Amino acid sequence: MAFALGQRWISDTESDLGLGTVVALDARTVTLMFAASEENRVYASNDAPVTRVVFNVGDVVECQEGWSLKVEQVVEENGLYTYLGMREDTEETGVALREIFLSNQIRFNKPQDKMYAGQIDRMDNFVLRYRALKNQYEQHRSPMRGLCGMRAGLIPHQLYIAHEVGRRHAPRVLLADEVGLGKTIEAGMIIHQQVLLGRAERILIVVPETLQHQWLVEMMRRFNLHFSIFDEERCIEAFAESDNPFDTQQYVLCSLDFLRKSRKRFEQALEADWDLLVVDEAHHLEWSQDKPSRGYQVVEGLAERTPGVLLLTATPEQLGRESHFARLRLLDSDRFYDYAAFVEEEAQYAPVADAITALFSGVKLADEAKNQITELLSEQDVEPLFRIIESNADEESKAIARQELIDNLMDRHGTGRVLFRNTRAAIKGFPVRNVHLLPMPIPTQYTTSMRVSGMIGGKLAPEARAMKNLYPEEIFQEFEGEESSWWQFDCRVNWLLEKLKAQRSEKVLVIASRASTALQLEQALREREGIRATVFHEGMSILERDKAAAYFAQEEGGAQVLICSEIGSEGRNFQFANQLVMFDLPFNPDLLEQRIGRLDRIGQKRDIDIHVPYLQGTAQEVLARWFNEGLNAFAETCPTGRTVYDQVSDQLIEMLASGSNEALNDVIAESAKLNQALKADLEQGRDRLLEMHSNGGEKAQQIVAEIAAKDGDTNLVSFALSLFDTIGLNQDDKGENAIVVTPSEHMMVPSYPGLPYEGATITFDRDTALSREDMHFISWEHPMIQGGIDLLMSEGVGTCAVSLLKNKALPVGTLLLELIYAVDAQAPKRSGIGRFLPRTPIRLMMDARGNDLSAQVEFESFNRQLSPVNRHLASKLVSSVQNDIHRLIEAGDQLVVENVEAIRQQAQQEMQQSLNSELERLQALKAVNPNIRDEEIEAIDAQIKELNGYIAKAQFQLDSLRLIVVSHN
């Protein structure tokens, strides 16, 4: 291929990009700019999947300025073409049009040309292509786009938050749900929607170091988003590709420490243009008005440069008011500029909360409540709504009127748009925790080794000594060697074996602090009783952990027990089990909550049994009793645990280090009293209004119902299997709702999008996917389906076919021509065009006289009456009626113009209606709620103008056609 600057080429694999221009060349690569879709592509020049665009005499070509030229002569000079001919608008002759000025929106690859050339496709491929077009159109139009395909349970408050935030332009919000309510999933859903809608192409996630892998796995497993972890080593590697390593990947995940410690890397991260910044554990960012921490400054710098920001943090009550204000300041420093003003404003929300509570309760509104609501909504006339609520209207009308008042009041609520927070108290459906504390006698082997260790290890700091005393099996191994079988005499192991034998049908999760303990416990279960167990620790790769988790999840033939180390279990959830054994205890109340959170999460169907075997007279007993009696941390979530621990830690560490528990009862009493007081403060500070707003109420239930209705879509299953067949993938039914899909030697393309080289196990069932992490959950949004549809379209699969209709009511040889047109507007994805005018199929069924019968002849039922024709016969049939086909296509082109105009008008109308009502709502709110950002209003205004232009320029093209001939035998 000989390239030259300014030449026009079209992509073979991405024809929707429009016409490309060669803008850069070097020894090995060529860069094409596709101005219509605002995309650039770099190809290897010796093997670029592009085709040179050359027009011939008689063709009509369009200039970028909008006028057309009928080509009369083609001149080539230095590899560039100039077209000479007549301008169709002014009829001026001898006009020259250089190829660089050709319109960027020219289309090619006509299906009729393929048909005339005898490149006729199989009938079932034509059918698959039409279904792909229809399904893709429906998916793009769906208001639930981006929410159906994630591997997560349908939990109302999560879906509500994601739906509310995910559609905004550059959302800047604080997600502050309590532990176990799924903030990571909410963030993932928002990211997923922003990516699918084209609003976020470059994303940076900043998390504590220990959570990097958890986020990597969650994004990949649940949302099919592949992030790259960046550390110093990765940045040095990436330097070969770019001066700024952060420019080498679109989706980047890194730790806050990494950016905090290296000014150079922080500055590089600042310079990379991100669309969305996500910060987890944002409550650890310390801030005070005069001295913000380095970590806070790092996030502040990134947040100032990035349009969209999601902060995931503890609840505002846990943070304290000032710290909570500091998070809001990161989102909008103009709005949250002064702490004192913020506190004063918060106090003014009490009447709003009272008014909404009155509406929620459904009781008759008192005059005082009505006056309050009228005053709060002073700029609108609320009397008609009051009349409906008090009339004899049906319950539904009353509920709608109530909801409208509630929505309007919510909008006035200061931080309602930037802060979402759900509590366990406000969300139903959590299991009861049954706690079983099991004191056990300490083996003499431990007593001896601990006494000796105490005598010779006197120099240890109290905290280190306390830590050591919690794990007597490790002290024993120090003296007897690592191979010593402590598990032969430890009564906790004996108890565990008996429990597992007694409950063979129950899945049991065992958590120990150390990886070595977990490995030795597995050995004990295997060697002593042949119990099927699997281990999970930080030394394993993500893939190995997945396999272990899948083995544990398997109902038949799976492991009965999963033994996890502390770090290994981070971020993994096993809701299908309800038996938790804590083989030892963590030092920290937050870690204890994390352990229980592996099972006690939203979505757990059964009550949980928590078993805590501990050795009497040891540090384990001190800690078990303090957690249980001082904090009640086993039976309930304990948001106050850390604060209480900080107050009594000195006395606690002293007891754990010395082994004496004389002061234990006093410390427990003091802790319990402190805990009660802190919890009462939290309850007092609960923001009822925020809770009502965050869980979404009735609206959240509707979203769940809508997605659940799509979940059992048999249409998807049959489409996916046909798609895999057509592209050439092997399929093997594995039972348990699972199919194994592997690449074959006869595939249409060397590698299939979204499918690993070794293949994948897939399921169409959400529940199966939730319990089996090794399976891909296939939905319309999954890359294997989206990529497959893109492949069909770009490879031109099914663009022309010939079928026979055996129908004795019609004369033999009767012709029908099925024409499928596609209407679309070439526009950048981020413009939001997909919501109003995605690629829209129009089907015409032309008879020999040029009448359209598509309204009378439905596609699927008609298709069942047709039979395929072999390629040789099909080619002969086409040759014999080529003139008729040509004539009917021309008639179809005339007819479709009206349909296209109607589609344009409908898209304009829907876009104006939807965006203008949102714009008006935000403008009205801006007057009463300073939380509405100017950028949001400006973005919608610009979007309306932009979309008007794109929709007006929407074009149609013939996507595919099928010739149907009537026969009687």
Swiss-Prot record:
Q: Which Gene3D superfamilies match?
A: 2.30.30.140, 2.30.30.930, 3.30.360.80, 6.10.140.1500, 6.10.140.2230, P-loop containing nucleotide triphosphate hydrolases (3.40.50.300), Tandem AAA-ATPase domain (3.40.50.10810)
Which UniProt keywords are present, listed alphabetically? Activator, ATP-binding, DNA-binding, Helicase, Hydrolase, Nucleotide-binding, Transcription, Transcription regulation
Q: Motif DEAH box: which residue numbers?
A: 280-283
Database matches in Pfam families: Helicase_C, RapA_C, SNF2-rel_dom, Tudor_1_RapA, Tudor_RapA
Task: Tell me the domain of life.
Answer: Bacteria
User: One GO molecular-function annotation for this sequence?
Assistant: ATP binding
Q: What does this protein do?
A: Transcription regulator that activates transcription by stimulating RNA polymerase (RNAP) recycling in case of stress conditions such as supercoiled DNA or high salt concentrations. Probably acts by releasing the RNAP, when it is trapped or immobilized on tightly supercoiled DNA. Does not activate transcription on linear DNA. Probably not involved in DNA repair.
Homology family: Belongs to the SNF2/RAD54 helicase family. RapA subfamily.
- The entry's protein name is RNA polymerase-associated protein RapA
Q: What taxonomic lineage is listed for the species of origin?
A: Bacteria, Pseudomonadati, Pseudomonadota, Gammaproteobacteria, Vibrionales
Gene of this entry: rapA
